[in-house]
C-alpha cells in the first residue's frame, strides 16, 4: 500500500494533469474559432473525434498500465502529450492541429486510468470512499480553475500558451513521476504492476472483489440493501453518466459560439462559462459529507431533469445572468450523476473488472455521440437555428426514458396495507 506521502504525490499529479488537460482541450475550440474560423458545427466534429478516440483508448490505456506498470504508463502518457504540444506550437494548418489534438487525447488516456488506480491502490473500503471524495474534488477543483482563468491566460500570454503552458506542466509531471517511482522503489512499496494487489483503473476506483464483498459505505457489515435493488441503481447510474458526458462534451464544444453570441471576450468567457465546473465541485463536496442521496431515486431523477433543462437553457439563453444560474444548476446535476456512478460501482458487491471497462467505453461513446448528433443536425437542418440544441436535448430525453424504464421494471411492488 502506498503511504500518505506517495499518495499525496499522486494527487499532485492528478491536480496538475486536470489543470493542463482542461486548459488545452477546453480552449482548443476557442483556438480553432479564432485561428481558422471554426463555428459550432466544426467544433462539434472536433469534439466527436475526441470522444471517439477516448472510447477506444481509455480502457486500453488502463490495461497497458496493468501490464507494463503504473509509472511506465504515466511516463509514456506525459511524454506523448508534451511532445505533441511542443510540435503543435510550431504548426499552422487546421489539419495539423487536429492531428496534434488526437495524439494528445491518446496520451491522456494513459494517465487518467493509471492515476485512478494509484489513488485507490491498497485502500481499505472505508479509506477508499474517503479517497474517492478527495480524488473528485482535486480534479474537479483544478479543472474548474483552469477553465476559469484559461481565457485570461490566452489573452495575456498569447495564443501559443495553449501549447506551451500544458507542455511545461507535462514536462514537470514527467520529472515528478520519475522521482515518485524512485521513492516507491526505495521503500519497496511499488516496483512493478505485477507486484501490486490489483490495478483496476477502469473499475472507477472500486476495491477488489474480496475487499468489496459484504462491505457497504464506511461499515464492514453486509450490505443491507436487496441485491437486485442495488444493481438497479448501478445500472441507472451507468446509464445516466454517459448521457451526462453527452451534454458536457457538446456544451464545451459550442461555448465559443455562446461567448460570441453574448459578446464576451475570451477572458470573460472563461470567467462566465466555467461556472458549471464550480457547481459540479460544490456538488462533489456536499455529496462527500452527506449520504442522504444514497439509493434515493428522486435525487438521481431530479439531477437528470436539471441536466436536461439547463443544457438547453445554457445554449439559447439571451443574457448573462440566466447563463450563470443555469450553469450552477447544470453543474450540480452533473456532480450527483457522476458521483452516483462512482458510489454505486463501489457499493454493489459483484461489479467485475470487465464491467469497469464497459463503463469507460460507454462514457467515451457518450463523448462522441452528443457532439456527433449536434454536428449532424446543423449539417442537415441548417435552416433551423437551434437544430443542434433540439437534437441533443431529444437524445438526453431518450436517456430519461431509459432511466424511468429501469426504475419501473426493478422497483419492488407496492404492498397494500
Annotate each language-model stretch with its function.
Residues 3-51, 234-236, 240, 249-258, ...:
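Helix-loop boundary and gating motifs at the non-cytosolic
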Residues 57-69, 154, 283-295, 378:
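Helix-to-loop junctions at the C-terminal end of transmembrane segments
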Residues 73-86, 167, 298-312:
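Structural signature of the two symmetry-related core transmembrane helices
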Residues 104-137:
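Cytoplasmic helix-loop-helix junction between adjacent transmembrane helices
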Residues 110-123, 335-350:
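Intracellular juxtamembrane helix-capping segments at the cytosolic ends
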Residues 155-168, 378-396:
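A membrane-interface helix-boundary motif in multi-pass transporters
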Residues 297-338:
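C-terminal transmembrane helical hairpin of 12-TM major facilitator-type secondary transporters
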Residues 353-380:
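A late C-terminal transmembrane helix in Major Facilitator Superfamily
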Amino acid at each position: 500500500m502506498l503511504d500518505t506521502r506517495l499518495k499525496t504525490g499522486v494527487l499532485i499529479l492528478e491536480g496538475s494533469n486536470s489543470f493542463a488537460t482542461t486548459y488545452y482541450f477546453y480552449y482548443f475550440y476557442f483556438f480553432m474559432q479564432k485561428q481558422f474560423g471554426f463555428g459550432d458545427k466544426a467544433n462539434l466534429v472536433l469534439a466527436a473525434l475526441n470522444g471517439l478516440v477516448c472510447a477506444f483508448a481509455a480502457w486500453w490505456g488502463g490495461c497497458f498500465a496493468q501490464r507494463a506498470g503504473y509509472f511506465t504508463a504515466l511516463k509514456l502518457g506525459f511524454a506523448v502529450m508534451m511532445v505533441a504540444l511542443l510540435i503543435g506550437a510550431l504548426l499552422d494548418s487546421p489539419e495539423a492541429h487536429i492531428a496534434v489534438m488526437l495524439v494528445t487525447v491518446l496520451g491522456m488516456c494513459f494517465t487518467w486510468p493509471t492515476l485512478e488506480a494509484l489513488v485507490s491502490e491498497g485502500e481499505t473500503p472505508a479509506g477508499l470512499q474517503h479517497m474517492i471524495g478527495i480524488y473528485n474534488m482535486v480534479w474537479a477543483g483544478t479543472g474548474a480553475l483552469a477553465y476559469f482563468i484559461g481565457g485570461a491566460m490566452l489573452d495575456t500570454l498569447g495564443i501559443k500558451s495553449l501549447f506551451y503552458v500544458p507542455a511545461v506542466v507535462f514536462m514537470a509531471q514527467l520529472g515528478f513521476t520519475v522521482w515518485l517511482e524512485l521513492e516507491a522503489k526505495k521503500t519497496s512499496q511499488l516496483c512493478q504492476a505485477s507486484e501490486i494487489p490489483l490495478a483496476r483503473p477502469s473499475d472507477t476506483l472500486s476495491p477488489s472483489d474480496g475487499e468489496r464483498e459484504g462491505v457497504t459505505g464506511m461499515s464492514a457489515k453486509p450490505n443491507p440493501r436487496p441485491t437486485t435493488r442495488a444493481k438497479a441503481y448501478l445500472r441507472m447510474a451507468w446509464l445516466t453518466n454517459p448521457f451526462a458526458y453527452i451534454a458536457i462534451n457538446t456544451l464545451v464544444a459550442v461555448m465559443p459560439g455562446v461567448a460570441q453570441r453574448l459578446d464576451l471576450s475570451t477572458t470573460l468567457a472563461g470567467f462566465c462559462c466555467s461556472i458549471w465546473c464550480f457547481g459540479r465541485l460544490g456538488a462533489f463536496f456536499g455529496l462527500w459529507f452527506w449520504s442522504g442521496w444514497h439509493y434515493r431515486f428522486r435525487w438521481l431523477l431530479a439531477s437528470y431533469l436539471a441536466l436536461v433543462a439547463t443544457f438547453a437553457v445554457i445554449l439559447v439563453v439571451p443574457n448573462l445572468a440566466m447563463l450563470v444560474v443555469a450553469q450552477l444548476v447544470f453543474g450540480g446535476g452533473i456532480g450527483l450523476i457522476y458521483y452516483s456512478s462512482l458510489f454505486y460501482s463501489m457499493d454493489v458487491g459483484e461489479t467485475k473488472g470487465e464491467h469497469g471497462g464497459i463503463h469507460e467505453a460507454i462514457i467515451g461513446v457518450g463523448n462522441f455521440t452528443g457532439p456527433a448528433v449536434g454536428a449532424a443536425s446543423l449539417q442537415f437542418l441548417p435552416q433551423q437555428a437551434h437544430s443542434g440544441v433540439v437534437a441533443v436535448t431529444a437524445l438526453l430525453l431518450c436517456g430519461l426514458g431509459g432511466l424511468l424504464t429501469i426504475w419501473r421494471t426493478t422497483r419492488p411492488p407496492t404492498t397494500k396495507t
